């Protein structure tokens, strides 16, 4: 397929069919998401769409398929009622909501999720709509948005174990898939990482370096991933004869990692190894260690988690446990589109395996 296959005017289905060497009907089925087309033919058609520059008429397609060709990508927060702050009194301000949004955009993890979702949707003529659902009102808006057909389904990245949004969507009969296992039993598909195995890799690496006074900066313990990483780390340390390991809880931010590292150094000045439950906190830990004159990794070895851009920006570059976020986000999207094509299919889960990436910090 070459550029000379482009039409002089706007590319048509016939142009795509000619470029792909298939029938117009086959092209139509692929573009409209019909499942009974051989995957190899689907890929040929998608390449032909790219080469010809064909753009489906969304309005006409929507009339036929009753689809919006859009997916809501929802970052959902804690189950805090509108009118109540984190302590259960007072009111949530615009600043509270702004800080939630700012934290989302500051974390490289969320950018990687968006990349994985967009890369999967774009070749299929679909696009994501980013939404935030950190309050009751915002969650109601997400449900209403889906009910009115503005998006075909939802991809949910939940930041709190008590998040009620997955339950609200399943009760409403709306298609949704989660990034990470739900904290409560909900009949909903999800993708996740074997977090405990990842923490085991981190602990074993520190022990293999002859670190013996090892501490951990955990993630927030109201988040399943934070709980699982801490459990995996503790279990591994206990199996190797270290039943007690100092813990300082963080919030998956660089600032919280810095504060946690300060607390650990004050209480355990002789520590020689640190496992931070994400890379931002690992970066914060390295910064504080340098300020206290501790060399990384000669005096204190540090291992992070995620293999995000923060790991490369860290000084020295951070040894970390890789979470294949882009691949996980793409699989989450595939599960949602499969659910849309087969509404009665049962909920399922896909668990990815972590990998240790060794760099300069440990």
Go through each PLM region and give its residues.
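Short acidic/polar active-site loop segments enriched in Thr and Asp
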Residues: 23, 69, 127, 152, ...
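Short gly/ser/thr-rich secondary-structure transition/capping motifs
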Residues: 51-57, 135-139, 286
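Structural motif corresponding to alpha-helix initiation and N-cap regions
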Residues: 10, 56-57, 139-140, 162-163, ...
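Generic structural signal for helix capping and beta-alpha/helix-loop junctions
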Residues: 34, 66, 81, 138, ...
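Alpha-helical recognition/docking segments in bacterial nutrient-uptake
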Residues: 5, 70-204
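N-terminal helix-turn-helix DNA-binding module of bacterial transcription factors
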Residues: 1-70, 362
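Bacterial carbohydrate/catabolite-sensing allosteric modules
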Residues: 2-6, 19, 51, 116-124, ...
């Amino acid at each position: 397929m070459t550029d000379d296959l482009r039409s002089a005017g706007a590319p048509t289905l016939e142009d795509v069919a000619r470029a792909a060497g298939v029938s117009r009907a086959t092209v139509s089925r692929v573009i409209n998401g019909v499942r009974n087309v051989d995957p190899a033919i689907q890929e040929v058609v998608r390449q032909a769409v790219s080469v010809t520059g064909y753009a489906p008429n969304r309005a006409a397609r929507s009339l036929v398929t009753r689809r919006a060709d859009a997916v809501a990508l929802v970052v959902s927060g804690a189950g805090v009622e509108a009118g109540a702050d984190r302590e259960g009194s007072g009111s949530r301000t615009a600043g509270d909501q702004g800080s939630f949004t700012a934290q989302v955009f500051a974390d490289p993890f969320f950018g990687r999720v968006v990349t994985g979702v967009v890369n999967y949707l774009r070749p299929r003529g679909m696009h994501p709509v980013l939404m935030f659902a950190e309050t009751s009102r915002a969650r109601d808006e997400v449900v209403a948005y889906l009910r009115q057909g503005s998006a075909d389904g939802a991809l949910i990245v939940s930041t709190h174990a008590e998040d009620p949004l997955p339950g609200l969507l399943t009760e409403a009969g709306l298609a949704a898939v989660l990034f990470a296992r739900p904290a409560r039993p909900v009949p909903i598909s999800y993708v996740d990482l074997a977090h405990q195995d990842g923490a085991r890799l981190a602990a074993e690496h520190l022990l293999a370096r002859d670190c013996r006074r090892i501490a951990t900066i955990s993630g927030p313990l109201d988040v399943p991933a934070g709980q699982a990483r801490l459990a995996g780390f503790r279990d591994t340390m206990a199996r190797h004869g270290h039943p007690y390991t100092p813990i300082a809880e963080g919030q998956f931010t660089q600032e919280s990692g810095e504060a946690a590292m300060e607390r650990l150094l004050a209480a355990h000045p002789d520590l020689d190894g640190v496992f931070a439950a994400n890379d931002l906190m690992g970066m914060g830990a390295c910064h504080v260690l340098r300020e206290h004159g501790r060399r990384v990794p000669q005096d204190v070895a540090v291992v992070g988690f995620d293999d995000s851009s923060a790991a490369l920006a860290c000084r020295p570059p951070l040894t970390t446990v890789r979470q294949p976020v882009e691949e996980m986000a793409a699989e989450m999207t595939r599960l949602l589109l499969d659910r849309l094509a087969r509404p009665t299919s049962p909920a399922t889960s896909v668990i990815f395996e972590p990998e240790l990436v060794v760099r300069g910090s440990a």
